[in-house]
Amino acid sequence: MSQLKNDRYLRALLREPVDYTPVWMMRQAGRYLPEYKATRAQAGDFMSLCRNAELACEVTLQPLRRYDLDAAILFSDILTVPDAMGLGLSFGAGEGPKFARPVENAAMVENLPIPDPETELQYVMNAVRTIRRELQGEVPLIGFSGSPWTLATYMVEGGSSKAFTKIKKMMYADPQTLHKLLDKVSDAVILYLNAQIKAGAQAVMIFDTWGGVLAHRDYPDFSLQYMQKIVAGLIRENDGRKVPITLFTKGGGLWLEQIANSGCDAVGVDWTVNLAEAKAKIGHKVALQGNMDPSVLYARPARIRQEVRSILADFGNGSGHVFNLGHGIHQDVPVENPKIFVDAVHEYSKAYHK
């Protein structure tokens, strides 16, 4: 593999010195880019795009051609794992994901297979290998998965949800079945992420998009303990380098100390979290990633720069901060605005790394 030319992202995750704060954006390969829309049209539909290694590589690299980003993230979807477990994933035009065979009871959990990442999910590993080759060591490649709780919400609800009544019914009325499901999904995710690391992912991130819908006493049992199980099962060194792990629970500000004790290297935070307070609580133990509200990217350039300055000031001096949005970039953001954002992070952060 090519020697890494820009390893600031990996160094910041390990709280090692950097000369400026590295930055990337969740969903940086996506619908706000006209070239992404063109490639997706060429693929035919979303899952065909994910399953074509060359096209998945192309959309992964597109934002790096426009913006001076410090990391690439694999173009894929968190639902590849439950899809490979036989739930029948589909994306209707303009609709969210749907599963033809949602998980409804203990017998269905029992019958779920744990997919082999190099057979049922080989298309993801092929994409990782292709992207690593094409990146030529410019920036690190991030692999990822959904968290067991977040994946289980889709598997039980049969798709996206606003109220999460089906999975919460299972959680309160039949917790044993839900724990069995979460345990099985954790095993599948460990295999999946380790396969991504072996294929060339240099860091991994676990997206716990729906952890924040849990009651404060349920989160450790139904979300965090399973992410902790994954962290304990992951390959932590590859190619002679540490493979850093970031956990991101949207709405997870209540549980920062517990997340930081999970064994991860970095904790992602959304825009509801005060970065200065988060650093004071857990910055001695883990790096922090975040946390600009993605809607700031609708603003005028001066307002974007002002927000970048404020967040950098919140974190203050030293390494251990990866600048990012607090969630994915919105699909109708003006395409020139991420450049203003990324360049501002690089320019204004240098003063904090002397």
Swiss-Prot record:
UniProt keyword Ribosomal protein, yes or no: no
Family listed: Belongs to the uroporphyrinogen decarboxylase family.
Upper lineage: Bacteria, Pseudomonadati, Pseudomonadota, Gammaproteobacteria, Pasteurellales
HAMAP family, per the entry: URO_D (MF_00218)
Sequence positions that bind substrate: 27-31, 77, 154, 209, 327
UniProt EC number: 4.1.1.37
Site (Transition state stabilizer): 77
Catalytic activity of the protein: uroporphyrinogen III + 4 H(+) = coproporphyrinogen III + 4 CO2
Signal sequence region: none
Subunit structure of this chain's protein: Homodimer.
InterPro entries: UROD/MetE-like_sf (IPR038071), Uroporphyrinogen_deCO2ase_HemE (IPR006361), Uroporphyrinogen_deCOase (IPR000257)
Subcellular location: Cytoplasm
Name used for this protein in its record: Uroporphyrinogen decarboxylase
Role of this protein: Catalyzes the decarboxylation of four acetate groups of uroporphyrinogen-III to yield coproporphyrinogen-III.
Any one GO cellular component localisation term in the record: cytosol
Enzyme type, top EC level: lyase
Pathway connected to this protein: Porphyrin-containing compound metabolism; protoporphyrin-IX biosynthesis; coproporphyrinogen-III from 5-aminolevulinate: step 4/4
Pfam families attached to this UniProt entry: URO-D (PF01208)
MF GO annotations: uroporphyrinogen decarboxylase activity
Domain of life: Bacteria
